[in-house]
């Protein structure tokens, strides 16, 4: 491709509304342009990268014996009503009515459509298992689209679905898909982690997320330094401390704390170390048989944070978890938040495992501006349950029993689920089994954010000059920069011959034939992240050589023109 016949569309300045590196560089490198909030046009350079990611995903899906198909973006409301998700999904589901007053949605996912297709086309156990996938545009009406294509309203996704007669068969396919995802991210040359995850609104029992590690990641992931264990911080289990609870040595004693409404203020004004105190959070209880919600107290060590997902899965706690209002707290306890504690509470108490091994600790006295010191479990508080309700912290023991946990930020780019029968049961998707009886199929679901991978790769591969693409998804393998070509008699012919020869050798080449200063050309090639640049200049031609520069390492290699094609191909593909 010659730049004179191409839309390079690079920008010198960083757009002011671009918050993260990938958004900034995708705009500056001429990969995307904003059409409206959360909506982007993919320019030629960006589309080349997107297509290369798609091709790798497609190849690995095909190797996993998944069959490609294509389903419509527009989906009828009755399928979503049948599955029960029409009301569950919320405002992110973009809905509309056509001229015939029929209601539709723009699909953020395709569980309903694929289940409807399979129940109509698959009738016998002999046709199972089967895995189907598509690479398709998805639409999600994000409340606050941001970070460019990282959180857009329209995006490209690969979604696959598998159908089985047994959980054992589902698990076997799930493992195949897990391996296929690992193969994809390894081929993309990305630093990633598969992590144990919560199933969320999709449903199901077993789930893994795939995260590309990056400081800008929205998710915190925990992984062991002694094994391959990794989990989303929301899912990672905080083990009970191995040390026993010390014996009580102090008596319960109240003391005034007019200046302390938080753990940090308790430390600042009264010298209480956060790990020697507890905080008490009041949430609404699961409704009783009459639909009435009471209150539940959640008690954690002062330096730990509540894990809402863990807490709301406790049978005593309402889901989704909701913090009690100050008015309800005062009515039930007689004190405001900031002075609450477990002593004397007349409501269910759930104590985190780490808080349960404390002795002689400090907590609110359930009286405004007052705390207790010398609190001890089973003496001052006797009726409580113990559960894991906190986020893990770096240095915690790994749940697998090997090593300690580290925490890094990650960008979720893939998510796989063992759905079970959530959708097939609701939509009556069954087949005749070996006994000739109708049996509901069990399902798996496997998603990859294709357009999100493009942004995530940039977050992990950039420097002060621009993008540093992993070779497999670079828009071009090589850029040719002929210095002052339009002022030279010999450079045009040599550059053109090398361009044609390298294309014939199977390389994706960008030939910068613009009438621009060399500095502008070099800056653009570094900005768009071409892995190798072939520099052709008069001085090197005097020695019958050209210069090959590696974008990632900065290494420069002098190559003889007579053997340039083979040498360059070996370096680029090496």
From Swiss-Prot:
- Enzyme Commission identifier(s): 6.1.1.15
Disulfide bonds listed in the record: none
**Molecular function in Gene Ontology:** aminoacyl-tRNA deacylase activity; ATP binding; proline-tRNA ligase activity
Q: Where in the cell is it found?
A: Cytoplasm
Q: Which domain of life is it from?
A: Bacteria
| The entry's keywords | Aminoacyl-tRNA synthetase, ATP-binding, Cytoplasm, Ligase, Nucleotide-binding, Protein biosynthesis
Instruction: Give TM segment ranges.
Output: none
Q: Which reaction does it catalyse?
A: tRNA(Pro) + L-proline + ATP = L-prolyl-tRNA(Pro) + AMP + diphosphate
Instruction: Give the principal location in a single coarse category.
Output: cytoplasm
Gene Ontology BP terms: prolyl-tRNA aminoacylation
| Pfam name, any one | HGTP_anticodon
Could you name the Gene Ontology cellular component terms for this entry? cytosol
Q: How does it assemble?
A: Homodimer.
Fill in the domain comment: Consists of three domains: the N-terminal catalytic domain, the editing domain and the C-terminal anticodon-binding domain.
Family stated for the protein in its record: Belongs to the class-II aminoacyl-tRNA synthetase family. ProS type 1 subfamily.
Q: Name the job this protein performs.
A: Catalyzes the attachment of proline to tRNA(Pro) in a two-step reaction: proline is first activated by ATP to form Pro-AMP and then transferred to the acceptor end of tRNA(Pro). As ProRS can inadvertently accommodate and process non-cognate amino acids such as alanine and cysteine, to avoid such errors it has two additional distinct editing activities against alanine. One activity is designated as 'pretransfer' editing and involves the tRNA(Pro)-independent hydrolysis of activated Ala-AMP.
Q: What is this protein called?
A: Proline--tRNA ligase
Q: Which organism is it from?
A: Pseudoalteromonas translucida (strain TAC 125)
Gene name per UniProt: proS
């Amino acid at each position: 491709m010659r730049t004179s016949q191409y839309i390079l569309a690079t920008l010198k300045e960083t757009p002011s509304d671009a918050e993260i590196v990938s958004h900034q560089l995708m705009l500056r490198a001429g990969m995307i342009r904003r059409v409206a909030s959360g909506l982007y046009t993919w320019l030629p350079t960006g589309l080349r990268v997107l297509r290369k990611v798609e091709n790798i995903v497609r190849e690995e899906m095909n190797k996993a014996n998944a069959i490609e198909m294509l389903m419509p973006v527009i989906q009828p409301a009755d399928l979503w009503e049948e599955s029960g998700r029409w009301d569950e999904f919320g405002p992110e589901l973009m809905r509309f009515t056509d001229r015939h007053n029929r209601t539709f949605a723009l699909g953020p996912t395709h569980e309903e459509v694929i289940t409807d297709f399979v129940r109509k086309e698959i009738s016998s156990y002999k046709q199972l298992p089967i895995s189907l996938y598509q690479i398709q545009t998805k639409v999600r009406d994000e409340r606050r689209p941001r970070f460019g294509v990282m959180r857009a309203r329209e995006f490209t996704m690969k979604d696959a679905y598998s159908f089985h007669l047994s959980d054992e068969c589902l698990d076997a396919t799930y493992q195949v898909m897990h391996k296929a995802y690992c193969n994809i991210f390894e081929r993309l040359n990305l630093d990633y982690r598969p992590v144990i995850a919560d199933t969320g609104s999709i449903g199901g029992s077993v789930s893994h997320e795939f995260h590309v590690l990056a400081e800008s990641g929205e998710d915190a992931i925990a992984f062991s330094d002694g094994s391959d264990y990794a989990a989303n911080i929301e899912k990672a289990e905080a083990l009970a401390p191995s040390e026993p609870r010390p014996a009580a040595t102090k008596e319960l004693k109240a003391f005034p704390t007019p200046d302390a409404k938080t753990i940090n203020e308790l430390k600042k004004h009264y010298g209480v170390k956060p790990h020697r105190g507890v905080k008490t959070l009041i949430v609404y209880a699961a409704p009783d048989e009459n639909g009435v919600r009471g209150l539940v107290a959640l008690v954690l060590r002062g330096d730990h944070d509540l894990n809402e997902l863990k807490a709301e899965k406790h049978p005593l706690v309402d889901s989704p978890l909701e913090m009690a209002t100050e008015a309800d707290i005062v009515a039930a306890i007689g004190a405001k938040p900031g002075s609450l504690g477990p002593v004397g509470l007349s409501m269910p108490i759930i104590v985190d495992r780490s808080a349960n091994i404390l002795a002689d600790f400090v907590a609110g006295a359930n009286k405004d501006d007052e705390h207790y010191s010398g609190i001890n479990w089973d003496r001052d508080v006797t009726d409580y349950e113990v559960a894991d309700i906190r986020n893990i912290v770096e240095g915690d023991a790994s749940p697998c029993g090997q090593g300690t946990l580290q925490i890094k930020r990650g960008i979720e780019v893939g998510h796989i689920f063992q759905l079970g029968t959530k959708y097939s049961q609701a939509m009556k998707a069954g087949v005749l089994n070996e006994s000739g009886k109708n049996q509901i199929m069990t399902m798996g679901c496997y998603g990859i954010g294709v357009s999100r991978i493009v942004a995530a790769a940039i977050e992990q591969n950039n420097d002060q000059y621009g993008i540093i693409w992993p070779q497999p998804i670079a828009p071009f393998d090589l850029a040719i920069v002929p210095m002052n070509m339009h002022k030279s008699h010999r450079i045009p012919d040599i550059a053109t011959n090398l361009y044609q020869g390298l294309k014939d050798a199977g390389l994706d080449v960008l030939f910068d034939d613009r009438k621009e200063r060399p500095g502008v050309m070099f800056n653009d090639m570094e900005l768009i992240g071409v892995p190798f640049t072939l520099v052709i200049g008069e001085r090197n031609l005097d020695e019958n050589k050209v210069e090959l520069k590696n974008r990632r390492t900065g290494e420069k290699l002098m190559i003889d023109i007579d053997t340039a094609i083979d040498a360059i191909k070996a370096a680029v593909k090496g």
